[in-house]
């Protein structure tokens, strides 16, 4: 890392990068990612959910710098495939800090998990149990149960999870196969908007624990999944959710139950850390007569169509697959007398579906101007393609020196509770490209005794 002087912010770095390419024809889209924001999120997590160990959902954003940062902080990792397991283990994360949290796995990838020492994994069907039994008899299994995800933005229970009735049958089958069922997992859906969903799911998990005890299983691990917001522009704030989860955990899984509790946050850690800068590569002015608009609120005689160099086949795939609603932010402050026009923003590909914003009001911009999109860290870079030959944006990482020092303190002490609280909200930032990042060896504070 190259640390910058005190007083710089991520926005300053973004403006600096824009200035650097302003005289060039190659005004490619790029990200600025504040890794210090991830450190702050980690501190916030442990304050709000002190009993719950985070296992970061790698699928949300698999950027190596993000994974390395969380590894140093002592987080565990929720992996869904052989490739994700390889990524996490390549940076020195021990298998005890990995859960293979995909209930439907390819047989060859189950074998890879066994050969890699990854024992914790989820299942939700008899077929999956039988697939696991032969290649991975020492697996430590969590039964994934279904939840009421009707209040989630991205629903998962239609695809994954066993009902309570089916759960007993699966536990009995696992007993016959001599497999170890060590716990229960669930996921209330991504973008959960009703914290009471967690309460019901935790209650259901308690029922399954009791079933397991009746059958002689030693169940000691509860995985409460994800569904936690990663930005502040949401109706239900993070602490509003955790204030409901904590009493439910204390009620159904009190401390003396000796149950270890983990979760699978993804967007919580990375959404707000990433800001995307896109450049206007083309512009079209459409008269009101051409649009056929009779909207009385549309007082201007034209609408504007902007074409930018990233789209729904790239970073904005989150619009299609994650139900995201992105908000454009002007890079330059408009003049007081600048008028506003009805605008739409489109991606660079030849597909007519490549639309980022259907309608918004902005001052008139020109080709070469920049538009920013905040909260772009979740389910963006991980699923971006190179359709039509358009490349993925470069990522520039920033972090403050005090945040870096705090991260080292957490690593060395291994217990977050021993780290003196620090206010890192207004710390100076540093900048480095992903390829130049070096991290010390990771700690093992998130290990689960399996």
UniProtKB/Swiss-Prot annotation:
<dbReference type="Pfam" id="PF02784">
    <property type="entry name" value="Orn_Arg_deC_N"/>
</dbReference>
<dbReference type="InterPro" id="IPR002433">
    <property type="entry name" value="Orn_de-COase"/>
</dbReference>
<comment type="subunit">
    <text>Homodimer. Only the dimer is catalytically active, as the active sites are constructed of residues from both monomers.</text>
</comment>
<dbReference type="Pfam" id="PF00278">
    <property type="entry name" value="Orn_DAP_Arg_deC"/>
</dbReference>
<feature type="modified residue" description="Phosphoserine; by CK2">
    <location>
        <position position="293"/>
    </location>
</feature>
<feature type="binding site">
    <location>
        <position position="351"/>
    </location>
    <ligand>
        <name>substrate</name>
    </ligand>
</feature>
<comment type="pathway">
    <text>Amine and polyamine biosynthesis; putrescine biosynthesis via L-ornithine pathway; putrescine from L-ornithine: step 1/1.</text>
</comment>
<feature type="binding site">
    <location>
        <begin position="264"/>
        <end position="267"/>
    </location>
    <ligand>
        <name>pyridoxal 5'-phosphate</name>
    </ligand>
</feature>
<feature type="modified residue" description="N6-(pyridoxal phosphate)lysine">
    <location>
        <position position="59"/>
    </location>
</feature>
<protein>
    <recommendedName>
        <fullName>Ornithine decarboxylase</fullName>
        <ecNumber>4.1.1.17</ecNumber>
    </recommendedName>
</protein>
<dbReference type="InterPro" id="IPR022643">
    <property type="entry name" value="De-COase2_C"/>
</dbReference>
<keyword id="KW-0663">Pyridoxal phosphate</keyword>
<keyword id="KW-0597">Phosphoprotein</keyword>
<dbReference type="GO" id="GO:0033387">
    <property type="term" value="P:putrescine biosynthetic process from arginine, via ornithine"/>
</dbReference>
<dbReference type="GO" id="GO:0005737">
    <property type="term" value="C:cytoplasm"/>
</dbReference>
<keyword id="KW-0210">Decarboxylase</keyword>
<dbReference type="GO" id="GO:0004586">
    <property type="term" value="F:ornithine decarboxylase activity"/>
</dbReference>
<dbReference type="InterPro" id="IPR022657">
    <property type="entry name" value="De-COase2_CS"/>
</dbReference>
<feature type="site" description="Stacks against the aromatic ring of pyridoxal phosphate and stabilizes reaction intermediates">
    <location>
        <position position="187"/>
    </location>
</feature>
<dbReference type="InterPro" id="IPR022653">
    <property type="entry name" value="De-COase2_pyr-phos_BS"/>
</dbReference>
<keyword id="KW-0620">Polyamine biosynthesis</keyword>
<comment type="similarity">
    <text>Belongs to the Orn/Lys/Arg decarboxylase class-II family.</text>
</comment>
<keyword id="KW-0456">Lyase</keyword>
<dbReference type="InterPro" id="IPR022644">
    <property type="entry name" value="De-COase2_N"/>
</dbReference>
<feature type="binding site">
    <location>
        <position position="379"/>
    </location>
    <ligand>
        <name>pyridoxal 5'-phosphate</name>
    </ligand>
</feature>
<feature type="binding site">
    <location>
        <position position="190"/>
    </location>
    <ligand>
        <name>pyridoxal 5'-phosphate</name>
    </ligand>
</feature>
<feature type="binding site">
    <location>
        <position position="227"/>
    </location>
    <ligand>
        <name>pyridoxal 5'-phosphate</name>
    </ligand>
</feature>
<dbReference type="InterPro" id="IPR009006">
    <property type="entry name" value="Ala_racemase/Decarboxylase_C"/>
</dbReference>
<dbReference type="InterPro" id="IPR029066">
    <property type="entry name" value="PLP-binding_barrel"/>
</dbReference>
<dbReference type="InterPro" id="IPR000183">
    <property type="entry name" value="Orn/DAP/Arg_de-COase"/>
</dbReference>
<feature type="binding site" description="in other chain">
    <location>
        <begin position="321"/>
        <end position="322"/>
    </location>
    <ligand>
        <name>substrate</name>
    </ligand>
</feature>
<feature type="active site" description="Proton donor; shared with dimeric partner">
    <location>
        <position position="350"/>
    </location>
</feature>
<comment type="function">
    <text>Catalyzes the first and rate-limiting step of polyamine biosynthesis that converts ornithine into putrescine, which is the precursor for the polyamines, spermidine and spermine. Polyamines are essential for cell proliferation and are implicated in cellular processes, ranging from DNA replication to apoptosis.</text>
</comment>
């Amino acid at each position: 890392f190259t640390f910058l002087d005190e007083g710089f912010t991520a926005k300053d770095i973004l403006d600096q990068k824009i200035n650097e390419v302003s005289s060039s024809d190659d005004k490619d889209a790029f990200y600025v990612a504040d890794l210090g924001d991830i450190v702050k999120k980690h501190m916030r997590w442990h304050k709000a959910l002190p009993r719950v160990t985070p296992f970061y959902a790698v699928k949300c954003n698999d950027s190596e710098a993000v994974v390395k940062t969380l590894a140093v902080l002592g987080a565990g990792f929720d992996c869904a495939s052989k490739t994700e397991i390889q990524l996490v283990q390549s940076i020195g994360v021990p298998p005890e800090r990995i859960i293979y949290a995909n209930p439907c796995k390819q047989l060859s990838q189950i074998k890879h998990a066994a050969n890699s020492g990854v024992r914790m994994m989820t299942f939700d069907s008899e077929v999956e149990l039988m697939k696991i039994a032969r290649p991975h008899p020492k697996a430590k299994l969590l039964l994934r149960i279904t939840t009421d995800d009707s209040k989630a933005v991205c629903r998962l229970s239609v695809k994954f999870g066993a009902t309570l009735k089916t759960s007993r049958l699966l536990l009995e089958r696992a007993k016959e196969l001599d497999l170890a069922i060590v716990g229960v997992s669930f996921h209330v859906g991504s973008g959960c908007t009703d914290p009471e969903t967690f309460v019901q799911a935790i209650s259901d998990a308690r029922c399954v624990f009791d079933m397991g005890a009746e059958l002689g299983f030693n169940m000691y691990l509860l995985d409460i999944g994800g569904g936690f917001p990663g930005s502040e522009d949401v109706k239900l704030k993070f602490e509003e959710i955790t204030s409901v989860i904590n009493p439910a955990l204390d009620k159904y899984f009190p401390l003396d139950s000796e149950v270890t509790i983990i979760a699978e946050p993804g967007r919580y850690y990375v959404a707000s850390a990433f800001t995307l800068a896109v450049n206007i590569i083309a512009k079209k002015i459409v008269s009101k007569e051409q649009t056929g608009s009779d909207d009385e609120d549309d007082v201007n005689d034209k609408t504007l169509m902007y074409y930018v160099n990233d789209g729904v086949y790239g970073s904005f795939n989150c619009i299609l697959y994650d139900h995201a609603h992105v908000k454009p932010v002007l890079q330059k402050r408009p003049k007081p007398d600048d008028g506003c026009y009805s605008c739409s923003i489109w991606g660079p590909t030849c597909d007519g579906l490549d639309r980022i914003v259907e309608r918004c009001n902005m001052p008139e911009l020109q080709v070469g101007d920049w538009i920013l999109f905040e909260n772009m860290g979740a389910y963006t870079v991980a699923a971006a393609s190179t359709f039509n030959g358009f490349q993925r944006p470069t990522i520039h990482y920033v972090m403050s020196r005090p945040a870096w020092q705090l991260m080292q303190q957490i690593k060395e002490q291994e217990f977050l509770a021993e780290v003196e609280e620090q206010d890192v909200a207004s710390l100076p930032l540093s900048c480095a490209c992903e390829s130049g990042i070096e991290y010390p060896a990771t700690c093992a504070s998130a290990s689960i005794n399996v």
